[in-house]
């Protein structure tokens, strides 16, 4: 059964595929359109430049009337990111609007990387260093940027980069299993 929430998420996914914002990528997991994986690339000319950061987005059937729960999966050192990866961002809380879509959420988080709000800290050490010792703050950010290179492509981030995922396949899992089986047979039978 397709609910309004699921239809909206299918539209959000289609929009992300057809008109992707610079530096962000996201897709539903293979078996659940309410669970997404995303990648945010660190904005250029910022301490986060060249970083590749994985996130998870958990939607409910109340989306778009209620925001998703968004967390960094990648390690993050930022004034507005809690130790568990949860993000302190007004549009994900008290300033949420149903007009926001997945692209807007991801680009807002990407902007937050460069423009933290140290007055509303989720990580007090990061906020303090950002305000009082920018050099040490940037050194710690560089460490997580380098760590993001080592961890990229492991486990959960792989589905995000698939360009061939069809919306119908996500909405109706298993619909294309026969195609997948044929592809697997062809791959295992080839002599390289």
From Swiss-Prot:
Question: Looking at the record, which segments are called Disordered?
Answer: 1-28, 171-192
Please name the catalytic residues of this protein. 88 (glycyl thioester intermediate)
Where does the signal peptide begin and end?
none
Look up the record and name the pathway of this protein. Protein modification; protein ubiquitination
Q: What class of enzyme is it?
A: transferase
Give the UniProt record's GO annotations in the biological process aspect: DNA repair; proteasome-mediated ubiquitin-dependent protein catabolic process; protein polyubiquitination; protein ubiquitination
GO molecular function per UniProt: ATP binding; ubiquitin conjugating enzyme activity; ubiquitin protein ligase binding
Q: What is this protein called?
A: Ubiquitin-conjugating enzyme E2 1
Q: What lineage, starting at the top, does this entry show?
A: Eukaryota, Metazoa, Ecdysozoa, Nematoda, Chromadorea
């Amino acid at each position: 059964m397709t609910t309004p929430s699921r239809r909206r998420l299918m539209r959000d996914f289609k929009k992300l595929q057809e008109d992707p914002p610079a530096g962000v990528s996201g897709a539903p997991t293979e078996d659940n359109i309410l669970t997404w994986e995303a990648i945010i690339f660190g904005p250029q000319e910022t301490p986060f430049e060249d970083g590749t950061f994985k996130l998870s987005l958990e939607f409910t059937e109340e989306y778009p009337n209620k925001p998703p729960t968004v967390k960094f999966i990648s390690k993050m050192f930022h004034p507005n990111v809690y130790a568990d990866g949860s993000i302190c961002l007004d549009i994900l809380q008290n300033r949420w609007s149903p007009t926001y879509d997945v692209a807007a959420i991801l680009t807002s988080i990407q902007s937050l990387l460069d423009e933290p709000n140290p007055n509303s800290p989720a990580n007090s050490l990061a906020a303090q260093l950002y305000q009082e010792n920018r050099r040490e703050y940037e050194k710690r950010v560089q460490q997580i940027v380098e760590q993001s290179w080592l961890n990229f492509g492991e486990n959960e981030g792989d589905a995000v980069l698939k360009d061939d995922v069809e919306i119908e396949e996500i909405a109706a899992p298993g619909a294309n299993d026969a195609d997948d089986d044929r592809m697997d047979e062809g791959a295992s039978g080839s002599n390289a």
